[in-house]
Amino acid sequence: MIPNWAEERHSMVATQLAGRGIFDCRVLRALSEIPREQFVPLDVRIQAYADAPLGIGFGQTISQPYMTALMAERLCLDGSETVLEVGAGCGYAAAVLAMLAARVVAIELIPALADLARENLRRTGRGENVQVIAGDGCLGWEELAPYGAISVAAAAPEIPAALVRQLGDPGRLVMPVGGDGDQELRLVTKLDGHIDTSVATHCRFVPLRGGQKRR
């Protein structure tokens, strides 16, 4: 039997998000409207709204809904920003950010996943203000910097200097930092030339990879 996806989304928002401290109404609305099931592979579609990350191929994952919501909420977007997303994956988080910001620049290292993200965004009607670029997210995307916010969906031992440099002032960046077994979701805030860093939560993400030319 085909699930009632609208009910699945409503339940996910109520229990996994609002029930765990996500209070930003715009973030909750975005995740209640975007059809997550249309962004995941067919073989895991039945689990689209599970409280867990799901494989999307090439050793990559789509984050659990709570983590997508938490990262978006911590960016405190007001709708005027250009957001840089590193690790576009299947395009789902970019779709969420696109409902919260003026423009999203989403970088994906794996060309086939960049193509998938573009197609998913096009097919679901969520790509009008999203530009997907196949390239090395560790380098950011200098051409459109500075960014009002940066979201990184892969972990590294430290935050790449290029991303901090491309973060606007004021600006906020969220990224998991650490190794395979111990990662922290860090929030970097830049204001009046000062940079502050805090820890939002512990987490577990795939590693941030680099070394591929942009296209």
Regions found by a protein language model. Give the residues of each.
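Class I SAM-dependent transferase core
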Residues: M1-L84, Y92-A95, L100, L113-T124, ...
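Conserved nucleotide-cofactor-binding alpha/beta core module
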Residues: C76-D196
